[in-house]
Amino acid sequence: MPGTSVSDLSTATAVDAPALLPLPVARPSAPAVVRGKLYIKTHGCQMNEYDSAKMADVLAASEGLELTDNPEEADVVLVNTCSIREKAQEKVFSQLGRWKALKAGGKPVIIGVGGCVASQEGEAIVKRAPYVDLVFGPQTLHRLPELIRARRESGKSQVDISFPEIEKFDRLPEPRAEGPSAFVSIMEGCSKYCSFCVVPYTRGEEVSRPFEDVLVEVAQLAAQGVREINLLGQNVNAYRGAYGADAGDPAQYADLGLLIRTIAQIEGIGRIRFTTSHPLEFSDSLVDAYRDVPQLANCLHLPVQAGSDRILSAMKRGYTALEFKSRIRKLRAVRPDISISSDFIVGFPGETEADFEKTMKLIEDVGFDQSFSFVYSRRPGTPASDLQDDTPETVKQARLARLQAHISAHAASISQSMVGSVQRVLVEGPSRRDPNELTGKSENMRPVNFPGNPRLIGQFVDVLITEAMSNSLRGRIQLDDSAH
């Protein structure tokens, strides 16, 4: 039921949708008085980008800090870290070493380390870099104002890397839209414990935000002009959002499919995406959402990691290559032209040439559009870090190059096949290449550049694709026949 107003959601009847209380519509809040400058450097995933935006919101609301692109003029400098790749810790300490000079002459700059490296290292960061004032984890970013005040009052570095369930979302200010597309975190952590991954140790186990809390945030963003919602989670399709307990009844739980159906009813929301998924949790309910919800973007990022069952077992992924392909077949039965992207780890300990060929066979069978692919990176403290790894680095790099070349060639053929088609594009702003043109993204995440009036920014337009290039598409706005 697209176009349903937020206040009508209490009577909306999507398939299996629960009765909802009316959701508040966002009203612009008075801007905070600017009392200082904030600089944030972000490494890693979209979840970190979301968290950094929330850090900025928290500190703007509580401390009056305004973002700056120059750390030298900032009163608070934060690095939001990622521990997925090798040598992440050393990169953080290199960054901190450069920032140490910011305190020269006794300037009272607050230096903070957040994110997953902070969760892993904790007090060790302060011991190695005693000029660091704050160390906080992904689940405690909402406590930044208290940590800053405690640091200033006590003169001692503050460390808080606890996992206080979902508390941080209850204490975040109203979201602020920064363009027509926005991220909304719907859950935190992961309980899959893949043998190569640090996420369960740095972000904790899976905790879902309450169903109605997510809807409130989406409604607030929609009221500010957001038209595309990107639902975020480390294992987003494991979402189980509680609802209904406030009425005295036992809580019920909404899965991702139901959440998508309900978000699609919120006025103004024209496109929904989600990331990152786990194949084990890719349910029939989600396939049905792809069948029934036109706002759900015609693309999916579903990390498979490898095509060899032996390697998948060693990774503790919980599925086989055949089971993965079965899920893709179900999805393509309802969305035949859906774009599929994935993650791959090349050179996992014990990977043979035969194992790698099975990965290449899977890639050929599925026809992936894009990939995030890397050579295996040993992460301390994970089960895989104890496995013997005797494959030469040159072999791993050669395999990676072959895999990436294959997927890139297929992606190029998909782009070429889009020439002559009409694509629905959300206009994001002026093109970087040519400020006299507009740019936006197609449903399958292709940047599209085209001539157009800046008044179209924030709207969906139909664009006839006229040219495919290596990393983008060109086109022209397709006028409705009724306009002639």
Curated annotation (Swiss-Prot):
- The gene behind this protein is miaB
List of residues binding [4Fe-4S] cluster 1: C45, C82, C116
What InterPro entries does this protein map onto? Elp3/MiaA/NifB-like_rSAM, Methylthiotransferase, Methylthiotransferase_CS, Methylthiotransferase_N, Methylthiotransferase_N_sf, MiaB_methiolase, rSAM, rSAM_horseshoe
- Please state which protein family the record places this protein in: Belongs to the methylthiotransferase family. MiaB subfamily.
Q: Would you tell me the protein name for this molecule?
A: tRNA-2-methylthio-N(6)-dimethylallyladenosine synthase
Essential cofactor(s): [4Fe-4S] cluster
Q: Which residues form the TRAM domain?
A: 416-479
Top-level enzyme category:
transferase
Main location, first listed in the record = cytoplasm
In its UniProt entry, the species of origin is given as Xanthomonas oryzae pv. oryzae (strain PXO99A)
